[in-house]
């Protein structure tokens, strides 16, 4: 199941951003976030990275590959 639309909308609303504002902040077409949230289309990898960075979460979280929203840095030994 594609969790991107639901997670994207929830995170965007939590940040109190309009769809248009998030699209512009990420350098995307003004309708891009709306299309992603409705499932009309999926973001290209570079757009997904921009959105994740702007919302402060990992791309894996947006895609539903993990239930942890933040990346964890594990120091090398």
Report the location of each language-model feature.
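A short, Lys/Arg-rich alpha-helix, primarily the initiator
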Residues: 1-14
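Residue-level detection of the helix-turn-helix DNA-binding "recognition helix"
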Residues: 13, 27, 38-40, 49, ...
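Short alpha-helical DNA-recognition segment
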Residues: 16-35, 50
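Short Asp/Glu-rich motifs
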Residues: 31, 42, 71-72
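DNA major-groove recognition helix of helix-turn-helix/homeodomain DNA-binding modules
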Residues: 44-61
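Short, charged recognition helix plus adjacent turn
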Residues: 63-77
């Amino acid at each position: 199941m594609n969790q991107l639309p639901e997670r994207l909308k929830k995170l965007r609303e939590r940040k109190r951003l309009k769809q248009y504002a998030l699209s512009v902040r990420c350098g995307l077409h003004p309708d891009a976030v709306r299309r992603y949230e409705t499932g009309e289309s999926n973001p290209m990898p570079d757009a997904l990275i921009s959105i994740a960075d702007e919302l402060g979460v990992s791309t894996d979280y947006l895609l539903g590959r993990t239930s942890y929203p933040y990346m964890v840095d594990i120091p090398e030994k």
